[in-house]
Amino acid sequence: MVQDGKWELQNLKFVGEFMEVNGLSTTMIAEKLGISRQSVYYWLKKDDAMMSNIYAIFETYGLKIRFDLVEEGVQESPMKIPGVGLATKKPRIGFFESYIKRMGIKREQVAEMFGVKKCTVDHWFQFDDCFFSYICKFAQLKGLEVKYTVSRIND
């Protein structure tokens, strides 16, 4: 766990680093997103946010962020398939849905892992959004890492 200002960040460590490197405060991010400072503060305090909010933070600053699930210690994902349809249809959690499908993991099994109902997992994939902590926990349970890359939107 990394101490970042007032927060001990593990899941959202990369968000804290982004803020620190760019001299951003919770107020500055909140103003850019058009939300309350308390919302951003809450995400950092809880070390969790909806995927849509994580993407919004980076997009607001002209950046795109891409996530991938990879085996621990692997630099590039051996499962990475360029141009998979899910990635464009579901830009936020398509990587997660794609992974569980490739591994033959059923949504019922995902729901059981987190102690939620299958309809909750169905909702995530229908609306292409879930809390980032679920993805981190899934990765931990399966011996995976959540990797991310950040680039300019026009790249």
PLM ranges: what are they?
Residues 1-22, 75-103:
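A short, Lys/Arg-rich alpha-helix, primarily the initiator
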Residues 14, 25, 50-53, 106, ...:
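Residues that mark the N-terminal boundary/hinge immediately upstream of a DNA-recognition element
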Residues 16, 27, 97, 108, ...:
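Residues within the helices of the helix-turn-helix
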Residues 19, 30, 58, 100, ...:
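The alpha-helix within a helix-turn-helix
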Residues 23-40, 104-120:
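Short alpha-helical DNA-recognition segment
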Residues 44-45, 61, 125:
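DNA major-groove recognition helix of helix-turn-helix
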Residues 52-67, 132-148:
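DNA major-groove recognition helix of helix-turn-helix/homeodomain DNA-binding modules
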Residues 68-78, 151-155:
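Short amphipathic recognition helices of helix-turn-helix/homeodomain-type DNA-binding modules
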